[in-house]
């Protein structure tokens, strides 16, 4: 399957993401602890933990830090009895947005999430309002420059659902989330080095963003990601190469 240019859509946010690296690490550690507590410390037997481990490594977290977080979870440190909460809503331009949180205080979390939606021209919805538009999948991403046929052959042989090649040469491999770890291991063994690997919520439809709505959507994402309790933000906003170029 072919797609638009991917790197133009993401590179303009890289500097902001790098500036948030400390906060990103805190959130990943929280997920590692919770995943290990709920499903055990073996990533091969715990898909949620495996996804957290791969995300940690994609963000250049050291093995020592990663292993300490897993040990905390196995040892019963739950960081204040955290629970996973999913919020759903609509963002600028009618975008569907899902917000995955880890929280020990629902009232605090929903207040912060609702504030971000309201501030950016969106609104927080009810359970199920947009979830039907998303499917949970593993996503293994490769930067431009790899042999597309080699990635596709290795991915499909390993049990991937789909391989998307973009106009700029970037490649995304989609897997069932339950077998994400096994597919990633097979691709690693084939010598294919991923740019990133994570379990995500993939939208079934896209909402096209224009020069007016795109910056508003990015502001909403940034505000949500600034919330300590927010782990992930998923949306179906699509930013064209032309619009992305105006945001850099």
From Swiss-Prot:
Keyword Cytoplasm (UniProt): yes
Biological process, per Gene Ontology: regulation of DNA-templated transcription
Keyword Glycoprotein annotated: no
Gene Ontology CC annotations of this record: cytosol
GO molecular function, one term: DNA binding
Coiled-coil intervals, chain numbering: none
Source species, domain of life: Bacteria
Gene3D superfamilies according to UniProt: 1.10.10.200, 3.30.70.980
Location (main, coarse): cytoplasm
Record key words, sorted: Cytoplasm, DNA-binding, Transcription, Transcription regulation
Transmembrane regions: none
Annotated localization: Cytoplasm
Family listed: Belongs to the TACO1 family.
Stored PANTHER family: TRANSCRIPTIONAL REGULATORY PROTEIN YEBC-RELATED, TRANSLATIONAL ACTIVATOR OF CYTOCHROME C OXIDASE 1
Listed name of the protein: Probable transcriptional regulatory protein NT01EI_1596
Organism: Edwardsiella ictaluri (strain 93-146)
Organism classification: Bacteria, Pseudomonadati, Pseudomonadota, Gammaproteobacteria, Enterobacterales
């Amino acid at each position: 399957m072919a797609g638009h240019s991917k790197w133009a859509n993401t590179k303009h946010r890289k500097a902001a993401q790098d500036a948030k690296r400390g906060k990103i690490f805190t959130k990943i550690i929280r997920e590692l602890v919770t995943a290990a507590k709920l499903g055990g410390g073996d990533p091969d037997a715990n898909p949620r933990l495996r996804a957290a481990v791969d995300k940690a490594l994609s963000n250049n977290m050291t093995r020592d830090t990663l292993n300490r977080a897993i040990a905390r979870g196995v040892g019963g440190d739950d960081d204040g009895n955290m629970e996973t909460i999913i919020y759903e809503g609509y963002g600028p331009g009618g975008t569907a947005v899902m917000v995955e949180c880890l929280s020990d205080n629902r009232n605090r979390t929903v207040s912060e999430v609702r504030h971000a939606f309201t501030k950016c021209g969106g609104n927080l919805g009810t359970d199920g309002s947009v979830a039907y538009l998303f499917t949970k999948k593993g996503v293994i991403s490769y930067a431009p420059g790899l042999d597309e046929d080699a990635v596709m052959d290795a991915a499909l042989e390993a049990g991937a659902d789909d391989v998307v090649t973009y106009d700029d040469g970037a490649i995304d491999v989609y897997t069932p989330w339950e077998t994400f770890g096994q597919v990633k291991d097979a691709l690693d063994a084939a010598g294919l080095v991923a740019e990133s690997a994570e379990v995500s919520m993939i939208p079934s439809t896209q909402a096209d963003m224009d020069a007016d709505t795109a910056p508003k959507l990015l502001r909403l994402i940034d505000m949500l990601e600034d919330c300590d309790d927010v782990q992930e933000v998923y949306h179906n906003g699509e930013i064209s190469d032309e619009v992305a170029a105006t945001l850099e």
